[in-house]
Amino acid sequence: TQLPDVPMMARIPLSQARLCDAVVDRPSSLSARAVNQLAQALLPPGITGRAVLVAPAAPGDFQTDLAVAIARAAAQNGRRVVLIDGNFRNPRVAHAIGVTNQKGLVAALTGRLRLSQCFFRDTRSAAIMLACTQGLPNPSQILASPAMAQLVAHLRGVCDLVVIDSGPVLATNDAAQLARLSDVTLLVCNRAPRETIAQAMRELGGTAAQVALVSMELPRAA
């Protein structure tokens, strides 16, 4: 299958350590250095207010681990970062960073709580998180709502980087909805077949301002 002309923005070597922890615990590792280079490419010096969507081509492609790692790497470099869990059907950010948060993004979008009441600080960096800890009956409707667009626009105005974690591109149109709100969509691929990657690119092509590939590479067996 011929892949569309989309740049490969990064190749991230994976190891036994979780990527989101490696950027903190093992900053000189190949994985951490690759994430830092990616974070710097996404947010060059002097640039602020960028929104980046991290979406997998297929389930199990480590996108949440990468989203948390990018947020932590940028925060360690002194940037103001917010990470949004936009995977309403299968939220993973809170679990990935080891917290239990009962407020979350949905309460802010529906007006039940002020936005400031829904933020919580990452346990291992200065990044701020907006988690989604509950299943929703109508996630696509909420993601496409004016409230979601206004939230992302507001955060872009006060932060250097907004990272949005998303579910698989081909499962629903959720990722495509979030791509409309983002400057760059990182399409994360690991073991997805080329046809799946090509189909995901086509799905994003009509909505995303820019799409770039990130390959998560498992170590090869000896």
Sequence positions of predicted segments:
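Structural beta-sheet core signal
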Residues: L83, M129, I164, L186-L187, ...
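Conserved acidic residues
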Residues: R50, I128, D160, D183, ...
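Switch II (G3) loop of P-loop NTPases
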Residues: I84, G104-T110, M129-L178
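Short boundary/hinge segments that flank catalytic cores
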Residues: T1-V68, R72-R80, G86-V106, S116, ...
